[in-house]
Amino acid sequence: MMNIGVIFAGGVGRRMNTKGKPKQFLEVHGKPIIVHTIDIFQNTEAIDAVVVVCVSDWLDYMNNLVERFNLTKVKAVVAGGETGQMSIFKGLEAAEQLATDDAVVLIHDGVRPLINEEVINANIQSVKETGSAVTSVRAKETVVLVNDSSKISEVVDRTRSFIAKAPQSFYLSDILSVERDAISKGITDAIDSSTLMGMYNRELTIVEGPYENIKITTPDDFYMFKALYDARENEQIYGM
């Protein structure tokens, strides 16, 4: 059974205020963010293949990056859809073409470059044991729910609160079945794969990941990634 990373790099980075270049292609130490992300999957032995879902206007650019950085596990680069959900669906369809039978798919954000091999392996193991894996971190602060009047309607028990991140992983046949049924019913804009699977009452299993597994969405996130990346490099160089 194959383990396939489906890496979503479909955003255009409006909140980053970048001029012309989508956020996933911004460079840190001479390497685009999306390449930093793919590198983790490339260097994880358990990963057999990677599918990249890309902004349609940047397909050639992404293919050039695959060649330039020798990302040999990237077997397909496909154009995204009109929504995040539809983009992921296109990536899953490409994964289906690669898989010889059912597969474990790890759906990941291209702008989460601080994932690690341990979490990827834990996702794969969780899918094999329970059918799903949603990489998450424990909430450090209290989560509250609000009503339409912006009044707090519920204070959530922090000891039971997690923040869902990525990868979010499933058997390919399971997530594709749900995606196809949802699309047939006009559901095309679920916020993420775990939300969609939850709508279909599928059991979802937590896999705890690192807090530094941030999604680079704003300039603050970008500079935080640079700082964390430099800290990791210094640890390797100086044995800190």
Curated annotation (Swiss-Prot):
Site, as annotated: Positions ribitol 5-phosphate for the nucleophilic attack: 158, 215
Catalytic activity entry: D-ribitol 5-phosphate + CTP + H(+) = CDP-L-ribitol + diphosphate
GO biological process: cell wall organization; isoprenoid biosynthetic process; poly(ribitol phosphate) teichoic acid biosynthetic process
Signal peptide region: none
EC code(s) of this entry: 2.7.7.40
GO molecular function: D-ribitol-5-phosphate cytidylyltransferase activity
Top EC class for this record: transferase
Entries under InterPro entries matching the protein: IspD/TarI, ISPD_synthase_CS, Nucleotide-diphossugar_trans, TarI
Record site feature (Transition state stabilizer), residues: 15, 23
Keyword Lyase recorded: no
CC terms in the record's Gene Ontology section: cytosol
Binding site for CTP: 8-11, 81-87
Keywords attached to this entry: Cell wall biogenesis/degradation, Nucleotidyltransferase, Teichoic acid biosynthesis, Transferase
SUPFAM superfamilies according to UniProt: Nucleotide-diphospho-sugar transferases
Pathway: Cell wall biogenesis; poly(ribitol phosphate) teichoic acid biosynthesis
Role according to the record: Catalyzes the transfer of the cytidylyl group of CTP to D-ribitol 5-phosphate.
Family that this chain belongs to: Belongs to the IspD/TarI cytidylyltransferase family. TarI subfamily.
Name of the protein in question: Ribitol-5-phosphate cytidylyltransferase
Species per Swiss-Prot/TrEMBL record: Streptococcus agalactiae serotype V (strain ATCC BAA-611 / 2603 V/R)
This protein's encoding gene: tarI
